[in-house]
Amino acid sequence: MGRGAIVQASWLAFLAILLAAGAVPAATDFPNKPVNLVIGFAAGGETDIVVRAMNEELGKRLGVPAVVLNKPGSGGLVGAEFVAKSKPDGYNLLVLSLSHVLRQAGDPTMTVNVPKDFEPICRFVTQPIVLVVQGDSQFKTVENLIDFGKQNVNKLNFGSPGVGSVGHFSGELFKAETKATFKHVPFNGSAPSITALMGGHIDFLVTALPALGGKVASGDLRILASFADKRLSEMKDVPTMIEKGFPQARMAGWFGFVAPAGTPKDVLEKLGQAFQGTIKDPKIVETVQKMAFNEAYLSAGELSTHIKSELALFSKIAKEEGIVIK
């Protein structure tokens, strides 16, 4: 082949590469179609409600609709698997929660690896976690409860919505930090565990505040402490576990957004900017507060660190307490 033919062939190859590249939408065009916010739980649940409170505003900031897509099943895993296997282009995002991290901590066979299979975008809200007893419980302070638990091995029971739930791990964290002993009684959901507490069948719960509804205001239940960093604005008379001398007894339910691993950096940045603006919008802040959530934005990097820290902590607790989620 002559020199001219070689040059011509090289140019043809170069043009073919350019044409092929042009067939793929550039990341700078993002977004040019609706973005799906995938929830691994059924419509009408707390995750669904809080995400729907912000998807319209998010769509305005993205310039395309933000569509809530419910894919319930296997405790949120169906939705997580769907997003993990989606094309990493930013159009399918998972609403990730503490529940996904706890599932991985207690289930070594889990089909999704949270740190490896997803790119963090942001955390957007948290839920306060509180320790609650029956309204007429003999335990008037959290110190009373801890002291009794230390002096009477496994005489007290704490309930939860089920093995591996936020309530279960919260209770185990309480045990680990206070060095008191309590027996775990799992139920099939939050409502049965709260009913059991009100009926005196268990001694306490460690649970997300929204699950209690109006039962604290009615006097049926009484909160002894919160696991927040500081006193809750809506319950300034309730002390934190930190105040009581347990600085590591900190925990909150949380929700964030993640994309499939391999999503382009510029797409993640555009999503991050839109989410941050949405979450910080005063109307959205007010709306989520009325739902007993708190605006609690974390950037992608901060969320990544948070996930790894919580996964390490709760994997340790799962191993020590023999928690196996099936």
Predicted regions and their residues:
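Hinge/capping helix and adjacent helix->loop/strand transition within the periplasmic-binding protein
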Residues: L58, K85-N92, A105-P192, M241-E243, ...
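A ligand-binding cleft/hinge motif common to bilobed small-molecule-binding domains
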Residues: S99-T109, L173-E177, F204-V238
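An extracytoplasmic/periplasmic, membrane-proximal ligand-sensing/linker region
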Residues: N32-P34, A176-A180, E243, K265-K326
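N-terminal secretory signal peptides that target proteins for export/translocation
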Residues: M1-V7
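Bacterial N-terminal signal peptides
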Residues: A9-G22
